[in-house]
Regions:
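Active-site-adjacent core segments of small-molecule enzymes
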Residues: 1-168
Length: 168
């Protein structure tokens, strides 16, 4: 199933929204599958774990470039940028070898200590628009609360894969 950035970002000297589209045959077979009402609450995480243990996954990473500010507003994420008029263009391929994506000690470490924030990137990839400016404030407050609840003073930013508590 495709995933989209919703909001706009700098893309070097350009402005773009991003999309990630499955390329693998096994991934494409999952399109159109649904969760049943009586499925267990952890059905998605368990299915993802089983799938990633047994399958390599490949995605097309695409950019939809801003070409017309009137039709592609940056400040109103409620306006969809027309894909027929302004198509996504592939800029990279992302591949993940089969792996256990739900190792308990890694999940706890990630949940308790890591923060994911689009404002931590390069200026060339800076988040744009009012939604992202609001996210900057909300993410900072959310991080503070999460650290306090989890009993930590600060989040960590691993300098190398050796600091990650998972086989890589």
């Amino acid at each position: 199933m495709p995933e989209y950035s919703q909001s706009a970002y700098r893309f070097g000297d350009y402005v773009a929204k991003f999309g990630v589209f499955p390329l693998g045959e096994e991934q494409k077979k999952l399109e159109g599958t649904y969760i049943k009402d009586d499925d267990p609450i952890n059905v998605i995480s368990q299915h993802n774990r089983d799938f990633h243990i047994n399958n390599k996954v490949t995605y097309s990473f695409c950019a939809q470039l801003l070409q017309n500010l009137e039709e592609q507003p940056v400040d109103d994420i409620g306006v969809e940028w027309d894909e027929k008029k302004y198509p996504f263009e592939q800029v990279a391929t992302i591949e993940f070898e089969p792996q256990d994506s739900w190792i308990p000690e890694f999940r706890v470490w990630w949940d308790d200590r890591i923060t994911v924030n689009s404002w931590h990137g390069l200026k060339e990839h800076q988040p744009l628009g009012s939604t992202n400016r609001m996210r900057r404030v909300v993410y900072a407050e959310s991080r503070k609360l999460r650290l306090k609840v989890n009993g930590y003073k600060d989040y960590i930013e691993p300098a190398s894969l050796k600091e990650v508590p998972a086989p890589v």
